[in-house]
Amino acid sequence: MLPREIEELLNIILQHNTWRRKETINLIASENVMSPLAELVYVNDFAGRYAEGTVGNRYYQGTKYVDILEDSLSKRFAKVLDAKFVDVRPISGTIANLATYHALVPEGGIVASLPVKYGGHISHNTVGGLKALRVKTVELPWDFENFNIDIDAARKIIEEKRPNLIILGASLYLFPHPVREIANAAKAVGAYVLHDSAHVFGLIIGGVFPNPLKEGAHVITSSTHKTFPGPQGGLIASVTDEELNNAIQRAVFPVFTSNYHLHRYAATYVTLIEMEHFGAEYGARIVENAKALAEALAEEGVTPVGERLGYTKTHQVAVDVSKFGGGDKVARLLEEANIIVNKNALPWDKSVLKPSGIRMGVQEMTRFGMGKGEMKEIAKFIARVLKGEDPTAVKREVVEFRKTFIEIKYGFKIDKEIIDKIFYSLNLYT
């Protein structure tokens, strides 16, 4: 007999699993689901182990299999990304960012980045991680018409302010940033270019989004759980010299991490191999679905941004819902209908705390097998709620709609023999 508190905990887990995995239309742009095989190998003995240091140079014994995994995973990512160096030890995208900033920017140095209101991540700004590093920041300018960095104005700022580091990539990221143009401007003043690829990492590996390392970026950072559908974690990849790569390694440990959540390595490795096999098809379908969702929303009288530009070239769709009460109100209403989105500031908003927009991503629903036809159905569900229909009535239809899309696609199948091997190795079967 288990304690009552454990039974209650298990009930919470089971309720959450059923709700989020089987009954909702999840459109959070920063989330995804792992394949059954990746989830299976995520349960392993590495979860309780330590491996401070680097491959072959650890501060603990008992790490020979950690070394094999970490070394193989880093080298495989490097090959796929055409990078000279990859560090998979950061436990998140933000930690990857902070370690790279620490290695590239001296105390008192200057960082140029997009503010949050233009889509920049909090870790790109002094409201987030940069605040702890004692650096100065300058804002990259925004081209409202093209929903992107203003290239000409950015060149002038780079020439005038001479930053040590320029951060590209974004949290609201509809169209590729002008990496090549910014890299050319950076070269003239000796600045490094970092591209935060967290949102588009899977699209890069799938070949449907430009690889920033091939366009002039010195470093990319990423998380491993958005369009790249692995476990939560981070990585750094660079094409810079050995001295800088060593500086990045020293920043990852001992400055910003001690242990590295080793249990995620195997699941990340499985996901990388799956993306090598299925990533091109998966990535193409993601971008296709995002555009289809935006077009369908527009037909329903809901206003996605970027119409003149084709709405999106990533997994994301951004919608101006100011006429429906703003982002916070709309996100809450949609959750009542089991449609999960997040409120999001749009570039013209006066306050990021009272956003006029919502942000959506189609990567998870795509992995459950949805296509352009389903995007039209989702747009209709959203429009019905926004136009005043009772969310609980829509919710019943959403739950029924999801019953057809339970199996995770673009990954390897598993059988009971594999499950038994893993569980027996951990003494989970008695």
Curated annotation (Swiss-Prot):
The modification N6-(pyridoxal phosphate)lysine is found at residue 226. It is an enzyme of class 2 (transferase). Its EC number is 2.1.2.-. Its cofactor is pyridoxal 5'-phosphate. Keywords: Amino-acid biosynthesis, Cytoplasm, One-carbon metabolism, Pyridoxal phosphate, Transferase. InterPro entries: PyrdxlP-dep_Trfase, PyrdxlP-dep_Trfase_major, PyrdxlP-dep_Trfase_small, Ser_HO-MeTrfase, Ser_HO-MeTrfase-like, Ser_HO-MeTrfase_PLP_BS, SHMT-like_dom. One of its GO terms (molecular function) is pyridoxal phosphate binding. NCBIfam families: PRK00011.1 (NF000586). HAMAP family: SHMT. This is Serine hydroxymethyltransferase. The lineage of its organism: Archaea, Thermoproteota, Thermoprotei, Thermoproteales, Thermoproteaceae.
